[in-house]
Amino acid sequence: MGRVAVRTFGVEEELLIADPVDGMPLALASGILDVAGFSETDNSSDAGPSLKSEFKQEQIEVNSLPCRTAKELRAEIRAGRALADSAARAVGARVAALATPPVFHATPTAGNQRYAAMGTEFGLISREQLTCGFHVHVSIESPEEGVAVLDRMRHWLPVLLALSANSPFWMGADTGFASYRTQIWNRWPTAGPMDVFGSADGYRQVLSELLGTGVPLDEGMIYFDARLSRGHPTVEVRIADVCLYAEDALTIAILARALVETSASEWRKGEPPSGVMTPVIRMANWKASRFGVTNQLLHPLEQAPFAAADVAGALLRHIRRALTESGDLALARTGVANILRRGTGERLQRQAYGRRFRLSDVVSTAIASTHNYGERSDAGLLSR
């Protein structure tokens, strides 16, 4: 069980397709794929980011290539957003990194057979499922290592949710939540944190029993906060909102990679998983969803409320060695400090709404921020 040198990582960003004037979601994913040269069945690319259809025609997924360094991934994230937006402009729309649409009415699922079956089976849950997440894939050596990682990182994942929170509005109203996407997403029967699996066989047994109930239609509907990827030799960290700022997306990806490496290192050393109970992790997810970084979060080691900065600092200390080995320590500190200083996307959305109380302003501001890469930094807050 030798240590992997530097793990590759990549991301999937789900972006909202919106009218740039009134902010309404537009069902134009197929047109965007056509313009960009991708299809519903072939979204492969060897030369850069690619586009893919998603559950709703009002959203588009951007997939990065696997990357070795943060610099490479930053370029992929920016290029992916630009690619999607350029194609959206060609069909009269824009794309915005909004985890929920501020203005929305329930719509049918996208047109493929699988999504249609989900729409039939899950009714209003599927019709209202227009949310945009951010998934980080981190390479693993084996399913056994991957499950060991899942078992050891599960109680840290709510911190990533808090740092990404970007969905305060839903159906035209301020929900009071920083990440209301989490509340919408958790209506799916397999969503959320899981118990310790113990082994790759244990993981497969859980999947088999869940699929045997007939509730999830297929393995693609296993919506754990983190899971083994079906198509790649990776752990897929799925808990985060899509981040309004591209640099925040990079920060979440860096933290996720370091968390995977730290968890794998613990396994190699024979350290057991934390005994934190799954219902407590659900409480941590709820607080992260409710408050983002604006209030107290549950400390992963104490299972008690602490200031968000203290909890974020605990995560950085926990993964410091992995961040140092990958050369990402300073970048991670800067990224987390920026999020704590100016807030996540939920704060900018509420500020945009507060100026004129128009939800269209939220969308137009989000469009600009999605494609603005010139944000200043502040690394001092978490330098200790």
UniProtKB/Swiss-Prot annotation:
Catalytic reactions of this protein: L-cysteine + L-glutamate + ATP = gamma-L-glutamyl-L-cysteine + ADP + phosphate + H(+)
Pfam families cross-referenced by the UniProt entry: GCS2
A biological process from GO: modified amino acid biosynthetic process
Annotated keywords: ATP-binding, Ligase, Nucleotide-binding
InterPro entries for the chain: GCL_type2/YbdK_subfam, GCS2, Gln_synth/guanido_kin_cat_dom, YbdK
GO MF: ATP binding; glutamate-cysteine ligase activity
Cystine crosslinks: none
Top-tier EC class: ligase
Coiled coil: none
Enzyme Commission number(s): 6.3.2.2
Job description of the protein: ATP-dependent carboxylate-amine ligase which exhibits weak glutamate--cysteine ligase activity.
Entry similarity comment: Belongs to the glutamate--cysteine ligase type 2 family. YbdK subfamily.
Protein name, UniProt field: Putative glutamate--cysteine ligase 2-1
